[in-house]
């Protein structure tokens, strides 16, 4: 009898209800200031990160190898036979490589560590789908076979108030970090097949950029039913309006919303608005 554990990292932004429903094991990333280290979503909140960015921009680090080893030892003790792990894009963090390395040292558990090539709720959408399959009684091999297709069907699009935090954190990818800053040109950022940020399109100002996001959604939903996530990072006054705009579009199976993790917020800065599309 298979006993499958689901592992992810804190950038997947799985909420408490999902964690409880699917018994997800979450490995937290770290946020490091000059005088103190915090555990993502555990000992620091997104708002605390944004409130302090004008004073200090912290660095971030992946979950510790010790945390990963301890988790695997606990899973073995609890009789788990299989692990499905879904991580943030390996082009944005070393989490995938570290978890894969740790998993290879535990031969009593058959593991499949999967690079989401995504971030935030794009990563979380894969975890949710795997969790549903486990609850339905699907076996390990069946779920693993379906995961690459899940990844193909997920797209992330977002806008930020400024690119300076992506540039500072070295996460700028293929997004131009100089063009249009003074002209208030906003890139609509997405993630390509390699899990690297790129500019999907551009708009003049945030208002027009939001319109572009809605256009992308309408175009996609006109062709296929989708699950949609609306996300924000420190855009507390704007997220409800965006969700209202999205909710009026047809062919949405499930509409979810949430705030990105503090670790992600370090690299985007306040003001992020975005959507995740999962074609079903």
UniProtKB/Swiss-Prot annotation:
Cited function:
May bind long-chain fatty acids, such as palmitate, and may play a role in lipid transport or fatty acid metabolism.
Q: Which residues form a coiled coil?
A: none
Q: What are the cysteine partners in each disulfide bond? A: none
Q: What protein name applies here?
A: DegV domain-containing protein CA_C1624
One Pfam family here: DegV
Boundaries of each DegV domain copy? 4-279
Residue sites binding hexadecanoate per the record: 60, 93
GO MF annotation: an example? lipid binding
């Amino acid at each position: 009898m298979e006993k499958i554990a689901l592992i992810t990292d804190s950038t997947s932004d799985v909420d408490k209800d999902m964690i409880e429903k699917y018994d997800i094991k979450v490995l937290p990333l770290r946020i490091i200031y000059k005088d103190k280290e915090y555990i993502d979503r555990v000992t620091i909140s997104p708002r605390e990160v944004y409130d302090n960015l004008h004073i200090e921009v912290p660095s971030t680090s992946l979950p510790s190898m010790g945390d990963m080893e301890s988790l695997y030892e606990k899973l073995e003790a609890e009789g788990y036979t299989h692990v499905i792990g879904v991580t943030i894009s390996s082009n944005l963090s070393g989490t995938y490589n570290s978890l894969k390395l740790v998993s290879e040292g535990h031969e009593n558990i058959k593991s499949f560590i999967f690079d989401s090539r995504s971030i935030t709720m794009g990563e979380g959408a894969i975890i949710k789908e795997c969790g549903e399959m486990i609850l339905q009684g699907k076996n390990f091999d069946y779920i693993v076979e379906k995961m690459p297709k899940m990844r193909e069907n997920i797209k992330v699009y977002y806008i930020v108030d400024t690119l300076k935090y992506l540039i500072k954190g070295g996460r700028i990818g293929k997004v131009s970090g100089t063009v249009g800053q003074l002209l208030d040109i906003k890139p609509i950022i997405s993630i390509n097949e390699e899990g690297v940020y790129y500019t999907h399109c551009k708009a003049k100002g945030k208002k027009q950029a939001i319109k572009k996001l809605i256009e992308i959604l309408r175009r996609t939903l006109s062709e296929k039913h989708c699950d949609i996530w609306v996300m924000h990072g420190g855009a507390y006054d704007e997220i409800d309006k965006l969700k209202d705009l999205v909710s009026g579009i047809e062919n949405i199976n499930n509409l979810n919303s949430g705030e990105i993790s503090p670790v992600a917020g370090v690299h985007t800065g306040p003001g992020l608005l975005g959507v995740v599309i999962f074609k079903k």
